Amino acid sequence: MPDIKLKNQASLCASTRLFLAYTSIKPFDVAFHPKEPVVFSSLLTGQVCAWSYDDATGETSSSWSVRPSKRTARALSIEENGDEIWMGGKSGSLLCALTPPKVIQLSTRDGSMTRERDSAHECPINRVYCVNRNLVATGDDDGVIKLWDPRQADSIRTYSQHFDYISDFTYFDDKRQLVATSGDGHLSVIDIRSNKSTPLTVSEDQEDELLSIVPIKGGQKAIVGSGLGILSVWNRQMGWADSVDRIPGHPASIDAIVALTPDIIATGSEDGMIRVIQVLPHKFLGVVATHEEFPVERIRLDRNNKWLGSVSHDECLKLTDVEDLFEDSDEDDEMEEDEPDSDEEKSKKKKKDNGMKDMSRGQAENDGSFFADL
């Protein structure tokens, strides 16, 4: 496929609008409502906060805040119908709260708790993932994974193939496979249809912490972020034993990934930057947002693929407009038709098109050699 270019520096800065919902306390996770313009965040204090936002402008207003736990609320996940939000945290408890049909309307039910499972895990829960309406996955600091049916009081299966924290989950519906990444350097695949408490497969040791995962290429492949700043590409048709490609270049750990298109991902890194990268062929496209020197904890894309939500240690939830991030194909066609004839004009055009599209000139200089070896 042809390279997908970001808009030029001036246009990018003008069109990438940032709106901050300050939490005053360190946030750990971010989640978007699947049907409404509402964004949620879990906080160090055990709170879960909700903000409504304008679909067009991104302007936010606080909707509600609850504190279901006195200990850190680490992880959030929302059911596909948008009715309930699940929270896991340092206490090891698993909580479920209502997200009313119109969260922007304050009522006594805003954030009200519907279910609580004390001591769901023996140690802190690090990740929660709603697979579907009747299945929720949780992973803790010891590498234990549990599957839950909301209609039942206890977990339905427990997996212990990992020996370090569970960092992320993703799900492939065609094969009913839940994939988990871990700080022990392995990823594992669980067939949710199986009644056995053993995984379908466990990968080879990648000799690095695996921190994040997201499907790409229409679910044919997956890409995983690591502690050393390397992206690994996994081909499902070739199995999950080992990755098929590696993309070096990030100067710090890749703690979060989202897919913007089937071929384009955004990564949140320990150095505070959110980068956009094209995969197969590999190309670094630019930096679209930054949390300065604070590490990016999580990033999510909203239901319209317009707003990219990110949280960091800078005590704010940031919304970045990524809807018009890439040049329109019509613009590319016009540029090809108006291709300059002289070598001098071609040279000028090449310099203009290949410039790094970072949020500042300094960032562009720092990242100029990024992915230079690809």
Swiss-Prot record:
Compositionally biased spans, kind Acidic residues: 325-344
Segments of this protein annotated with the region Disordered: 325-374
Main location: nucleus
Stretches forming WD repeats: 21-61, 68-107, 120-158, 161-200, 205-244, 249-287, 290-330
Pfam entry (one): WDR55
Protein name (Swiss-Prot/TrEMBL): WD repeat-containing protein JIP5
Keywords: Nucleus, Repeat, WD repeat
GO CC, any one term: nucleolus
Superkingdom of source: Eukaryota
Alphabetical list of PROSITE patterns matching this protein: WD_REPEATS_2, WD_REPEATS_REGION
Family named by the database record: Belongs to the WD repeat WDR55 family.
Compartments reported by the entry: Nucleus, Nucleolus
